[in-house]
Amino acid sequence: MVNLNTIPPKNGRDYYIALGLEGSANKLGVGIVKHPLLPKHANSDLSYDCEAEMLSNIRDTYVTPPGEGFLPRDTARHHRNWCIRLIKQALAEADIKSPTLDIDVICFTKGPGMGAPLHSVVIAARTCSLLWDVPLVGVNHCIGHIEMGREITKAQNPVVLYVSGGNTQVIAYSEKRYRIFGETLDIAIGNCLDRFARTLKIPNEPSPGYNIEQLAKKAPHKENLVELPYTVKGMDLSMSGILASIDLLAKDLFKGNKKNKILFDKTTGEQKVTVEDLCYSLQENLFAMLVEITERAMAHVNSNQVLIVGGVGCNVRLQEMMAQMCKDRANGQVHATDNRFCIDNGVMIAQAGLLEYRMGGIVKDFSETVVTQKFRTDEVYAAWRD
């Protein structure tokens, strides 16, 4: 049993309020979360019974032209330009008149992520902390996704599939830490999809992965799945070879290279494969790999629940394939959230940070607010968990 309110709320109130700042990649998010003083069951897991109320969830995305990615310096400039106005908007939406009196803690993404954008956001967090005399909590970005997913879906102790632009991990909780059972050996799945979108020169708005998903739905030859590398090594997977292979196919398709017999009929020279077919084949291949390693983790930890978090977790086809796998397991369940919470946001940072704050995990000196691009999920001690 742990004290679920190690640090009491401000001014004798019966609730806590946290401001969360997220900016690890091209999305800048500001969120505000409210917790009651005590959960319904004082002996239980704080993160399961915290009864979070989302007061505000504001986000702005740095979007580049088709065929281009986002550079750290440009992304950081976007965050600097938008951070103050998003904070003001979030405070207004949450009806917070005096941050000094009303906000218990400011939570910021400490890592992992892109260095310059992370640094821009932590400077904003430090500034607000000094202006309002409010303590800080640094949050692991991956833990933020997990705790937000658990809060929204109420999944009790699932195997977590964390799929985003910079991370691909299969995770399960054990003994106060989120343990990584499997992960990518090279690039993340979101990175793979984004880079293929650049090859196709399709729009980056609302996101490259979403646009690939829409193209995949329109594939006219779903029965003719293009063969691609399938690289699963135990609990880990590799996606760089798949990307290299499909990039070459796309370039041959654009050039009209009829020597490529995968794309063109060897007798008539007619095109057999479309861009939509390539998108569909890439998705099916990548998602099959994810389902395989997730099922292996479920068997290992004897779990019948999967929680999909991260930006790629919004993909309906991934959710369908995972649900199909879970049907073959006793009482199998798939949990996922919509794009308000799957995609990077400030609320998830506020949620995870407030859980840590309530257990006494505050930053004692600004020297502890240095961000890190490499911050492993299993480095975090989850004091708020049973």
Swiss-Prot record:
Record key words, sorted: Activator, Acyltransferase, Cytoplasm, Metal-binding, Nucleus, Transcription, Transcription regulation, Transferase, tRNA processing
At the top level, the lineage of the source is Eukaryota
Q: What's the top EC group for this one?
A: transferase
Main subcellular location of this protein, as a coarse class: cytoplasm
SUPFAM superfamilies, sorted: Actin-like ATPase domain
Q: Does the keyword Nucleus apply?
A: yes
Note on how the cofactor is bound: Binds 1 divalent metal cation per subunit.
Q: Which GO terms describe its biological process?
A: chromosome organization; maintenance of translational fidelity; positive regulation of transcription by RNA polymerase II; telomere maintenance; telomere maintenance via recombination; tRNA modification; tRNA threonylcarbamoyladenosine metabolic process; tRNA threonylcarbamoyladenosine modification
Q: Per its Swiss-Prot or TrEMBL entry, what cofactor is needed?
A: a divalent metal cation
Fetch the Gene3D superfamilies from UniProt. Answer: 3.30.420.40
From the UniProt record, which GO molecular function terms apply?
chromatin DNA binding; metal ion binding; N(6)-L-threonylcarbamoyladenine synthase activity; nucleotidase activity
- State where substrate binds: 162-166, 194, 209, 213, 315
GO cellular component terms, A-Z: chromatin; cytoplasm; EKC/KEOPS complex; nucleoplasm; nucleus
Where does the record place it?
A: Cytoplasm; Nucleus
Which residues are recorded as binding a divalent metal cation?
141, 145, 162, 344
Q: Which reaction does it catalyse?
A: L-threonylcarbamoyladenylate + adenosine(37) in tRNA = N(6)-L-threonylcarbamoyladenosine(37) in tRNA + AMP + H(+)
The similarity comment for this entry is: Belongs to the KAE1 / TsaD family.
Listed under subunit, the entry gives: Component of the EKC/KEOPS complex composed of at least BUD32, CGI121, GON7, KAE1 and PCC1; the whole complex dimerizes.
Its annotated function is as follows: Component of the EKC/KEOPS complex that is required for the formation of a threonylcarbamoyl group on adenosine at position 37 (t(6)A37) in tRNAs that read codons beginning with adenine. The complex is probably involved in the transfer of the threonylcarbamoyl moiety of threonylcarbamoyl-AMP (TC-AMP) to the N6 group of A37. KAE1 likely plays a direct catalytic role in this reaction, but requires other protein(s) of the complex to fulfill this activity. The EKC/KEOPS complex also promotes both telomere uncapping and telomere elongation.
Q: Quote additional remarks.
A: Present with 1270 molecules/cell in log phase SD medium.
* Record's protein name: tRNA N6-adenosine threonylcarbamoyltransferase
